[in-house]
Curated annotation (Swiss-Prot):
Activator of the expression of chvE when bound to its inducer and represses its expression in the absence of inducer (L-arabinose, D-fucose or D-galactose). Negatively regulates its own expression. Belongs to the LysR transcriptional regulatory family. One of its GO terms (molecular function) is DNA-binding transcription factor activity. It comes from Rhizobium radiobacter. Pfam families: HTH_1, LysR_substrate. Signal peptide: none annotated. This is HTH-type transcriptional regulator GbpR.
């Protein structure tokens, strides 16, 4: 198992020395371990690059990096579940979600899971769908809730449509747009905007809104994937931002200095619960993740 961990660390850090440090061993020991793996497969698994090392085509062809992650994850979970069987409690789940379902679906499921599985370990990553899809294929999650990235083959996933993500435009309390006068999309384009990075689905959706209405895109744009920074900018400037409706309602419920402008373009995007496609005999989700996914689905359709 140490050999597999070493390969994963080399892929992540791009340097044998950094991989060795991550595993608390010396670089000569790490190099020797790499040589042992290459002797086993009778092919070089790494090669020097401009900065450190990268996997060779043999390493990629064997999919050792991804398979190693899967094997390590399964071994880790098997060990944990054996311990939990002995203690009569627990379970674990690794889930990724985009912002809206993280608030509306994952949080309620967490509450229910903690009641049903005393001692359960819940690991949640909130990120963009592109990042989550890559993480899922790397065996870092049991399932994710997000959109289907355009540049991913849907055949790589088991996909279950579970809901619609709604978004809205938000500004701070006291914003000039909140004076009660009729507001048009043209009025909004003159303000600063906070967008997700180019290519993000919500960003593309807003670009389509401007294009459909024949209105030029705002000139002053701040790009950030951070929801926290987006809200901070909205609450402290005259900027406008499109965010998930669930997030807007959550923040408004915390009495933050944020409100919807008189013009509110509702945006609907679908999001799905995805699990990585597995070989026929690989089995389905473990009990805790399976229940967690069912609870998310039940909340979505309720």
């Amino acid at each position: 198992m140490s050999h597999l961990r070493m390969l994963v660390m080399i892929e992540e850090h791009g340097q044998v020395s950094a991989a060795a440090a991550a595993m608390n061993m010396t670089q000569p020991a790490a190099s020797r371990m790499l040589s042992e793996m290459e002797a086993i497969v009778k092919s070089p698994l790494c090669q020097r690059a401009s900065r450190g090392v990268v996997l060779t085509k043999f390493g990629e062809a064997l999919a050792l990096a991804r398979r190693a992650r899967t094997i390590l994850l399964e071994l880790r979970e098997a060990s944990r579940e054996l311990n939990q069987m002995k203690s009569g409690s627990g379970g674990s789940v690794y889930i990724g979600a985009v912002t809206a379902p993280a608030i509306s679906l994952v949080v309620p499921a967490i509450r229910r899971a903690m009641d049903t599985y005393p001692g359960i370990e819940i690991n949640v990553q909130v990120e963009s769908s592109n990042v989550l899809a890559r993480e899922l294929l790397a065996a870092r999650h049991d399932f994710i809730i997000g959109r289907i990235p355009d540049d991913f083959d849907p055949g790589l996933f088991s996909i279950h449509e579970i809901g619609i993500e709604r978004a809205c435009l938000v500004v701070r309390e006291g914003h000039p747009l909140m004076r009660g006068e009729p507001v048009t999309l043209q009025d909004l384009s003159g303000y600063d905007w906070v967008f997700q990075p180019p290519g993000a689905l919500l960003r593309r959706t807003m670009e389509d809104v401007f294009l459909t209405h024949g209105v030029a895109m705002p000139r002053n744009v701040i790009n950030t994937p951070s929801v926290v920074l987006t809200l901070a900018l909205v609450c402290n400037t005259n900027a406008i931002a499109p965010i998930a409706q669930d997030m807007a309602e959550f923040v408004a419920g915390q009495q933050a200095d944020m409100a919807e402008p008189a013009f509110c373009q509702r945006i609907s995007n679908s999001w799905s619960s995805l699990t990585a496609s597995l070989p026929p005999k690989a089995g389905s989700c473990r009990p805790a993740p399976a229940c967690f996914m069912i609870w998310c689905w039940m909340k979505a359709v309720s």
